[in-house]
Amino acid sequence: MTPETVYLPDGQTYTVSPVFGGFGFKSNDLTHAAHFPVGWHIVVHTEEEKIVFQDGSEASVNGEGHAQPAGDDHATAVDAGDGSAQKRKKRVRPFVQPTRQNDTLFISSLSTPSTQEYGPPASPTRQIAMILWVSLYWYFHQREPSPRMSTKASHETPESAKPTGEWRITIQRDGVLRGRNLIPKLERMGLLATESTDVGTSLDDGDETWSNMFVSQRMFWQLPPNLFLFTLKPVKAPSPWPGSSGSPNDSRPGSPVAQGATHLAVRAMSPQPGVARLYNDLPGAPTPTNITAGVSTAHPITPFFSTSHLPTYYPPLTLQYTFTNNLRHPLRPKPPRMGEIFYSRFVPSVGRYLSFRVASLSPEPVPYFGPMGPNPPDHPELACLSDTQLLESWFAKPRVSAFWGKFTPEFLPTVVKLKHSFPAIGLWDGVPFGYFEIYWVKEDILGKVLGGEAGDFDRGLHVMVGEEWARGRASEWMTGLVHWCLTTDMRTMNVCLEPRIDNERILKHLDESGFGRERQLSFPHKQSC
């Protein structure tokens, strides 16, 4: 395997290179003076135990069969129960590509920067959790193995009809993960799971109960990344003022600059309006809209950014009920602020960062401070338009107006005042491409049509791709919206869309993205599918 770059949702990047017995992760952001790179190493290998039948065929004990290269075999005879002797073979081989349930991983070593450059993490357990999360983030971005399982009961079943199983990886209690009570802490954080859910009889974490831990693909993508991602705090923090990152904090705010041969002028080094306040208040500060284009900050401003360098996970609002128009429903949390990015993720198939931010009423363009992909963005001139100008240009296109109607100046001011919904702008590397609405189904007209079938925390989406160059990526941004809905509140069980019945293109994209068609619904203004 060749080295590859992993782009994290918060903008951090790591170079992953194969090393002896596993892979090395080197940070591209934690620059320091030492020669030894900052990062860690993981050991990944494949363990397989097979039953050899009398006819020479094999079946995996844990339900997976793969073509085997040469490796270490250990054969033992077992009784099949009908008097016929069978052999079990256990094989450990180097990791080549992911298997369905036979891969094993542990963190073998960790290299941290000097404490003279970066302060120690506030919690060593949090640091190990982030390292394991990043390692799993890389692993579950590999090519997914075949879902078919070859078990003892199905060894004569055709391959296309064999049962399917979860994609998961075993986490071995070894190396860095041998720390006292570390595995139980990671399990309580939701990062690890075990099928041994009894109390047990051991008084510590040294028994087999804590040695059989695993992470499945399904559970990993349901974990909020904000729970694990953070950055180390520099001993000398970078300045939020553009152009002055190399100046000491206690230097004068202005330096004399020669202009001609007769006089000196003071070059202003004051911060750009809003940037310093943004750094001081995050997370939670409103995004400034009076910053000139092209100004960059020291760190990408994402939902993961915090000046305290701690994880930015916030639990959902506790359950309490209220009434709206004689409808009883849970009290909803306030959505993010206008212009605030609430979702960010790198999409490898596109090679760009997908972001969603709340639409803004500002007459000025909303600046983008989020992470950027490795290539220059498409159509950067769109970032110079305000949200109102973007919507007006998108509504003017016949394919959009056919389903959304004509644009009016009151459209966006009306939507931002809705209590059960908020508008969003989708971006590829900071360039706007579409308009979306995220709403609570129960208080929406959809909830009224469904009657009592709408769940308390079901979400709904209205979608519109305004730019022609961004079409054809529906599966990527659709799964991003669903991912945000499911991770921001784990009580959300359903994400609904009700496109018009003649919108064949979006119906096709929904089928390809994993949505299921429930039924047709009759609204006062349309027939939906």
From Swiss-Prot:
It holds the Pfam family Acetyltransf_8. Its main location: cytoplasm. SUPFAM superfamilies: Acyl-CoA N-acyltransferases (Nat). The active site is at E498 (proton acceptor). Residues 59-95, 239-258 are annotated as: Disordered. Pathway: Siderophore biosynthesis. Its EC number is 2.3.1.-. Signal peptide: none annotated. Disruption phenotype: Leads to increased sensitivity to oxidative stress and iron-starvation, reduced conidial germination as well as reduced virulence. Reduces the ferricrocin yield to half but increases significantly the production of beauverichelin A and fusarinine C. This is N5-hydroxyornithine acetylase sidL.
